[in-house]
Amino acid sequence: HENRFRQSLKIYSGTQSVSNFRPTAAKLIYEKFGGDVIWDMSCGWGGRLLGFLSASNTKQYIGTEPSSKTYDGLQKMVKDFSYLGKQVNIYKLGSEEYKPMEESFDLCFTSPPYFDTEKYSLESTQSFVKFPTENEWVNGFLKKTIQNCYNGLKDNKYMLINIANTPKYKFIEKETVRISKELGFVQEDTVQLTLSSVMGAGYKYEPIFVFRKESK
């Protein structure tokens, strides 16, 4: 089953860019790691929301998204799929500001912005605008988001983060792992997400870091 999951993730993650997470890949992740209540810390364009709506084991999706335009599009998507009867709550704010109820989530799963690589808007709520230096972004956005995940997750439940270094910023993966471990998570795995195929160069992969909150 484990090998099948890994192979399927490579196939179904397809050729979408990271800012539009492929719903079929998200569905696989929900059905392997998820449960009733999901927090998507950076909703983006709705790929993980669509995966939630199609997954067999999910009941409530909580999302945070600071971009006004993206938020409006997500709300339209929620309305369009309301007939499925699943509960969806999306809040227009950054994940560093959202304070979840303690031990209320079965899974935290997202692909956050890669510092200033992906710019959904130039609003003051965007993490790269609020935290314009690498150090400010790591401590003001990334660390606070991971801390909120830890507080909100039930014991022995998972946080999955798809995030990668970029040619300009080499610190992103290392800092994500370091902070997660410092805050109490155990890293259990790293799985590969297929992003794209380049003519003659094969497929491009990004990591999805798999962390578990241990029992107290």
Where do the language-model regions lie?
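Class I S-adenosyl-L-methionine-dependent methyltransferase catalytic core
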Residues: 1-216
